[in-house]
Each structure stands twice: as C-alpha cells, then as structure tokens.
C-alpha cells in the first residue's frame, strides 16, 4: 500500500544493469533467433565507453535502451514467483534514469495490472507490493502516481480481496482529496479514479464505499455533459445503487447532480421513482408500481430483483415521514403515533408494527419509545426527508419559542440581579446608619465626663 517514500539501492552502472536485465529477459523468453541482448548491445557500447571515461551519458541512447527493455518486459509476469519482485525492482531502477520516466511507468503499471501466471495464489499481492514500491519512489507531487494508484486499485478489483481493499482504505480516506489537488486531476481523471475505487469496493463487498465513490464520480460531470450517454449510464448506476442500498435514505446528493436531473427526459420512470423515494410515501409508490411495474422501469430490468427491497425501504421512509409529522403536532397526541395509524400507512398487520418501528430506528431515521400498553410509538426525534420552506418555517417557529424562553430567563435573572443590588444597597445604608448612631452614643458620655473638668478649669 502507498506509504512513506522509498529508495531503491541497486549497485552497478546503467550499462551493466541494462545488459544484465536484457540477459534475464532472454532467459525467460528462450528465443530462437533475435534476443533483447542483441538489440541493445549496439546502444550500450557507446554508453559503456562514456561511463568508463566518466563523461556525460547520451540520454537519447539510454532512452532507446529503455524502450527496448520495457517493451520486452511483458514476459516478467511469467518469471518464477521469488524472482518477480527483484526483476521489477531492477526495471524500476533503470527507468528512473530515463529523461522522462513517466513514459515508461504507465506501461509497467499495465503489465502489473495483469494476472501473474507463475503465482496464481499470491500474484495480486506481488503486484500490489511492486506497484506500491513504484508509488513510493515517486515524488508526492508527481502526477504519475495517479496511474500507479489506478493500477493498484485495478489489481484489487480483479482479485476481489477485501483484505487488500481494507488495507488501502485508510490511505484513501486520509490522502485522496490531497492527491486529487496535488496531481491537478481534471474532471475526467477524477471520475476514472472514483469509478475505479467504486469497482474495487464493490468487488471487495464494501457497498458503502462503492456507493460513496459512484456519487463522487457523478459529481465530476460538468453541466454541459450531463445529457451525454456516459453521464446517463453513470447517473443510472448511481441511482440504481442508491435505491437498492439498504442503508441509503438521503437522496439529496443525487437530486442535486445535473446528470441525474437529465434523467427526467431520458429515463422518466426512473426519475419519477427517485422523486417518490425522496419525498413521497407508500401510497404514491404503490400507485406508481401499478402503472409502471418494476421490471419496466429500466430497459435491462435491473430493478426487478430488488422489488422487495424497494418496498421495504419505502415503508421505512413512510414511517419516518409519519414520525416527522407527529413532531409538529400539538395537543394530547403530540409526538405520538398509534399502532393503528402506523399499520394503516404501511399496509401491515398491527402485530408487525413494532418490528417496522424497530427497523426504522435501526436505520437511523427515527428515535422514540414503544408503548405496548398504550399501543403507541412516542417520537423523540425524526429525520426530515425533504427540508424545504415548511421545515424552515418550523425551525423559525421553534427558534422563536426558544428566544422567548431565553428572554424570559434573562428577564428573571435581570430582576433578581436588580433586587439583589437594591437589597445590598439597603443593607449597606442600614449598616452605615447603625454605625453613625453607635458613634453618637459612644461620644455622649465622654463629653459629659469632660464637662465638670472644663467648668473647674474655667473657675
């Protein structure tokens, strides 16, 4: 997996290593006449002389040698298992001495993205390890890392290894946005990368990651291309995946995409189904299905196997809508849903109401408490499926209530503070008055004692 930068330490001059690698390729090929050594020998001779004279190597000659070596390197995948990694490491070392290594790395990545016949059990692990070495020998800002990462993800998809994908996920989570920015990927390249990750995630059984990156890929489609066949296919894939995914209940990222909006004209039944799952209930869904059976929504009949899952999801969403409406009511039945109301809305027996409520709670759509004694569901919290003008008005109303409550609290605090100040001032004034009175009482007797002395002195 991609990790901190790696340096390959391989001793030998370019001509020596190139000749050694050509001989190894010939040993794998077992050719009858023309060999790689024969082809590169005339090119290596002047390079060898330049190395001996310690002069600047002819870069064009070196690139010509590398072209022949890389072209013949397709045979490396047939090498014995223990020799594959050292052989590719040598090739990577040679390619790094090219005037433009990127022109060779993409071809090497394509070789590694193919199966390794000599190691059917560990071939994918070997390819990922070698590709990771290539990735980590490149500078973090080198856009060639994009092609290497694509190859790594392709190998994981082909192997279907959940362990390999799980090992890559932390790097993708932490680095993918930065990589996209650093490599300056355009919309098409970003879309290729997200779709490759989505395919690998799906092959590894990680449906959440697959759905996330399909939506990310969808968001890279510019408005001008929203009606193109490729955009239509991606929008249908994203929408089908979201509708059938057991944990996806928020369709806002999809409805905001231009390519999905374009389905309104190209795939009207599918878009209508999206609108039902976005804001409507089981009643609207059943009316829609009666007019447009599931198998007729898409030309390839992709939704037919998921008919039961679709009905389950719309029931959960219907209950979420009921709960959200209950939170806005007032009176004795505020925030309360009777079993009878729920059973009627979901078209299920009352005996199954608790099961559906529990499933909706598990889905994170509502929170509350079931009362078997009173046959009701007390709603504590509910998810709004659509947050529009009505919901903003409700938020404004609640904020006004909280504001008035806070103003009342502030008024009480202000009154208490003023009362405390008044009482403190009164207490201080009373204490001062008591002090003055005490001073007068203490001063009177002393003056009376001094009076006879003053009279005697006067006499």
Swiss-Prot record:
Q: Which family does it belong to?
A: Belongs to the eIF-3 subunit M family.
Q: What is one GO cellular-component annotation here? A: eukaryotic 43S preinitiation complex
Q: Name one Pfam family in it.
A: PCI
Q: Where is this region: Disordered?
A: 431-459
Q: Where is the composition biased (Basic and acidic residues)?
A: 434-452
This protein is called: Eukaryotic translation initiation factor 3 subunit M
Q: Which residues form the PCI domain?
A: 207-384
- Role description: Component of the eukaryotic translation initiation factor 3 (eIF-3) complex, which is involved in protein synthesis of a specialized repertoire of mRNAs and, together with other initiation factors, stimulates binding of mRNA and methionyl-tRNAi to the 40S ribosome. The eIF-3 complex specifically targets and initiates translation of a subset of mRNAs involved in cell proliferation.
What's in the keyword line of the UniProt record? Cytoplasm, Initiation factor, Protein biosynthesis
Can you say where in the cell this protein is located?
Cytoplasm
Concerning SMART domains, the annotation shows:
PINT
Q: Which species?
A: Emericella nidulans (strain FGSC A4 / ATCC 38163 / CBS 112.46 / NRRL 194 / M139) (Aspergillus nidulans)
Q: How does it assemble?
A: Component of the eukaryotic translation initiation factor 3 (eIF-3) complex.
Q: Which InterPro entries match?
A: COPS7/eIF3m, eIF3m, eIF3m_C_helix, PCI_dom
PROSITE patterns (alphabetical): PCI (PS50250)
Q: TM segments?
A: none
Q: Which GO terms describe its biological process?
A: cellular response to farnesol; cytoplasmic translational initiation; formation of cytoplasmic translation initiation complex
* GO terms assigned for molecular function: translation initiation factor activity
């Amino acid at each position: 997996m991609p990790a901190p930068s790696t340096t390959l330490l391989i001793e030998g001059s370019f001509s020596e290593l190139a000749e050694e690698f050509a001989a190894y390729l010939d040993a794998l090929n077992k050719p009858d006449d023309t060999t790689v050594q024969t082809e590169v020998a005339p090119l290596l001779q002047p390079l060898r002389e330049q190395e001996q004279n310690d002069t600047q190597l002819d870069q064009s000659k070196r690139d010509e040698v590398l072209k022949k070596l890389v072209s013949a390197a397709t045979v490396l995948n047939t090498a014995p298992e223990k020799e594959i990694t050292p052989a590719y490491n040598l090739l990577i070392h040679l390619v790094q001495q090219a005037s433009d290594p990127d022109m060779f790395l993409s071809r090497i990545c394509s070789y590694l993205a193919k199966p390794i016949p000599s190691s059917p059990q560990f071939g994918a692990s070997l390819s990922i390890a070698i590709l990771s070495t290539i990735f980590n020998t490149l500078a973090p800002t080198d856009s060639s890392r994009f092609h290497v990462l694509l190859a790594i993800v392709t190998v994981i998809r082909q192997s279907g290894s959940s362990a390999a994908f799980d090992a890559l996920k932390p790097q993708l989570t932490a680095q993918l946005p930065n990589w996209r920015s650093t490599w300056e990927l355009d919309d098409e390249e970003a879309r290729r990368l997200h779709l490759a990750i989505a395919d690998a995630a799906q092959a590894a059984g990680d449906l959440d990651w697959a759905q996330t990156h399909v939506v990310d890929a969808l968001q890279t489609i510019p408005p001008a291309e929203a009606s193109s066949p490729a955009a239509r296919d991606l929008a249908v894939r994203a929408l089908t995946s979201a509708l059938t995914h057991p944990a996806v209940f928020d369709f806002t990222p999809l409805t905001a995409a231009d390519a999905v909006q374009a389905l309104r004209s190209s795939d009207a039944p599918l878009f209508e189904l999206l609108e039902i799952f976005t804001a409507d209930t089981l009643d609207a869904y059943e009316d829609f299905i009666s007019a447009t059976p599931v198998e007729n929504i898409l030309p390839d009949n992709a939704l037919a196997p998921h008919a039961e899952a679709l009905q389950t999801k719309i029931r959960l969403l219907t209950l979420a809508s009921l709960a959200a409406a209950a939170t806005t009511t007032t009176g004795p039945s505020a925030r309360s849903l009777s079993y009878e109301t729920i059973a009627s809305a979901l078209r299920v027996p009352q005996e199954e109401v608790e099961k559906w409520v529990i499933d909706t709670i598990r889905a994170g759509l509502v929170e509350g408490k079931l009362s078997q004694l009173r046959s009701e569901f007390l709603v504590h919290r509910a998810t709004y499926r659509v947050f529009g003008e009505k919901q903003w008005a409700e938020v404004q109303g609640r904020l006004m209530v909280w504001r008035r409550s806070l103003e009342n609290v502030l008024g009480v605090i202000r009154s208490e503070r003023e009362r405390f100040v008044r009482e403190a001032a009164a207490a201080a004034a009373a204490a001062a008055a008591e002090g003055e009175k005490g001073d007068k009482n203490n001063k009177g007797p002393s003056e009376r004692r001094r009076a006879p002395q003053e009279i005697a002195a006067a006499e």
